[in-house]
Structure formats: structure tokens, C-alpha cells
Amino acid sequence: EPRVNATVILASSELPDEGARIGGGTYLAKPGSYRVGGLRIEGFAAPHDRVGGRRFGQATVWRWQQAGLNFAHLGGTAAKLSGEDKVLLGRPDVLIIGVGGGGKVYNGEEAAEVVRALNPRRVIPVQYVNGEAPSGCDQGGVQPFLDAMSGMKVRNVGPNLNLPGNLGDNTVIEVMR
């Protein structure tokens, strides 16, 4: 398990296979408005799965502004975005989105559809397997998402990402490995 320290940890839910409290900092998992470390963070409920939340309940989708950039973190959700979701999220500068598939996370095609709908300037794919999936894991790798986003600029940035204040108008996918 990673040992990290952060000012705030945003979790999609508190299901046993996600939302583990492994680092220090303020832990948020429920919808609401929060102020943490000078940030105003808003979380709202969205179905966790493709059947309106009937299988895994509701997830929390996050948005906040930091260093002049608007962030949206869709975390663990596999539900189609509703019109209301699109209004609440707006056009984020930075979209953090699960792409590995499985029961609670967008697959590559679904994630690409969300990216096209929100038109962010930067996309950070998360919740995918890097290498071979462990036994029993229902998630896949990032490549199906990258294939679905064919023609989009992709940068492999490693474990750290620094964003400039001006991101430009075109979408760039930032793959952290």
C-alpha cells in the first residue's frame, strides 16, 4: 500500500475495495460542500454503476478550483453523465477520470464519450491496471481509452504532473505511470 500524506483525500465511496484511508489528511467521501486547506471542494452524488446505482449505490463526483484551474474528479463511476451532471461539472480545465472498466469504472469507450462531452483541456486517466491484472481484478489497462481517443495528444508524464497556468484550448491526455 502506498504511504502518502496529503491535505485532502477525495474518495468516490466507502466501499471496502475503494476509499481505504491509507494516508494522512482530511478524508472526504460524501456529497457536500467543504473547505479544506484554502480549497472549496464540492461533491455531488452520481450513480456508481451502469444500472442507476442499484448495484453499488451512489458515488461522489468532485469539483474544485485550485491555482486558477477548474478540476473535476469523476473517480469511481460508470454511469452515463446526466444533463444535470454536465451542468454541475461545466468545462473543467482538468478532468480526472477512471478508464479501466469493470463494474464501477468507465471502460475506455465510455470514458472517451465523457471526455468528448466535457471537452476538458487536460485529462488524467486513473483507475486502470498498469501491467498484468491481479487475479479477480475486473479492470483493464489504459490503452483502450487511448485508442478511443485516437488523434488526441498523449503525454506520458511519470508519477508527477506539473500543470502550467495556461493550458491552451486543445485537450491533452496526461498518463501518469
Positions of PLM-derived features:
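Residue-level marker of positions within ordered structural domains that often coincide
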Residues: 14-15, 128
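Proline-aspartate-enriched helix->loop->beta-strand connector
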Residues: 6, 92-96, 108-128
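Extracytoplasmic/secreted cell-surface and envelope-processing proteins
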Residues: 81-82, 103-109, 132-137
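Binuclear metal-ion centers of metallo-dependent hydrolases, dominated by the metallo-beta-lactamase
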Residues: 40, 122-177
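Short, charged/polar "capping" segments at the starts of alpha-helices
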Residues: 16-21, 132-134
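A general structural detector for well-ordered alpha-helical segments in enzyme core domains, enriched
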Residues: 60, 85-88, 110-114, 141, ...
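Core dinuclear metal-dependent hydrolase active-site scaffold
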Residues: 1-8, 15-17, 24-90, 94, ...
